[in-house]
């Protein structure tokens, strides 16, 4: 009788354990029923303030390809209309970009102005102008390293050696590379063709599509301190040139 009782208890224990395991298997998480196979991890930038888009440039010869400049997440490239993006600026000295421009004469030549064109406290600064001649595979710093914030780059539609750069200049200090810069040798040297003062930079430029010698430049006088922000001073204004920046 004692042997029978022991065997019965052993059988009941095994049955209870098997039932418990079955119950655990049947208890599934609600998300287990959702297919997540199509989702993949992706980088959204190295900083808390990432995600701000500074500029976008679309390849005029291939509308599936474009470049996205972010304020604190580098530069991204897509070759399939945005289905997938690849970071192409992560190995450079600046992760903040203010603008991206494709050479209208050669879509493999890309220009990047580092340092976002923004005046808020969490603004990220850059270290000048970068150029790629292989569609973003490699980069060279072309100068204007103390500009810190660049708003726009324009390449002459008929002459790739002529480039204009709108340099806003440092936000937290005076001086630096600020104003409208022009290069006539593909970015090897730069000439400041519109210099207002040590607190005023050029935030944007537009070229007349009918005449590349005609450009409009907007200037912005601003300075941020720990305790306040001063912006829109007398140096701010709108300028026009009809001779490619000579006057």
PLM features: what roles do these ranges have?
Residues 21-247:
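Beta-propeller blade termini and top-face loops
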Residues 1-24:
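Bacterial Sec-dependent N-terminal signal peptides
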């Amino acid at each position: 009788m004692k042997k029978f009782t022991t065997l019965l208890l052993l059988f009941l224990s095994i049955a209870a354990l098997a039932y418990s395991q079955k119950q655990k298997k049947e208890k599934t998480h609600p998300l287990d029923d959702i297919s997540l196979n199509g989702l993949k991890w992706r980088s959204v930038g190295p900083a808390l303030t990432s995600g701000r888009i500074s500029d976008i440039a679309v390849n005029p010869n291939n509308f599936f390809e474009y470049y996205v400049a972010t304020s604190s997440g580098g530069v991204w490239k897509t070759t399939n209309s945005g289905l997938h993006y690849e970071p192409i600026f992560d190995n450079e000295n600046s992760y903040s970009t203010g603008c991206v421009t494709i050479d209208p004469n050669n879509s493999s030549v890309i220009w990047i102005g580092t340092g976002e064109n923004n005046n808020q406290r969490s603004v990220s600064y850059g270290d000048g102008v970068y150029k790629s001649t292989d569609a973003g595979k490699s980069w060279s710093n072309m100068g204007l390293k103390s500009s810190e914030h660049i708003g726009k780059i324009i390449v002459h539609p008929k002459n790739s050696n002529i480039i204009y750069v709108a340099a806003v200049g440092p936000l937290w200090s005076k001086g630096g590379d600020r104003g409208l810069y022009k290069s006539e040798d593909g970015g090897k040297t730069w000439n400041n063709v519109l210099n207002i003062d040590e607190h005023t930079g050029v935030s944007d430029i537009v070229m007349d599509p009918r005449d590349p010698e005609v450009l409009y430049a907007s200037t912005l006088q601003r300075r941020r301190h720990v305790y306040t922000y001063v912006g829109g001073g007398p140096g701010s204004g709108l300028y026009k040139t009809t001779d490619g920046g000579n006057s």
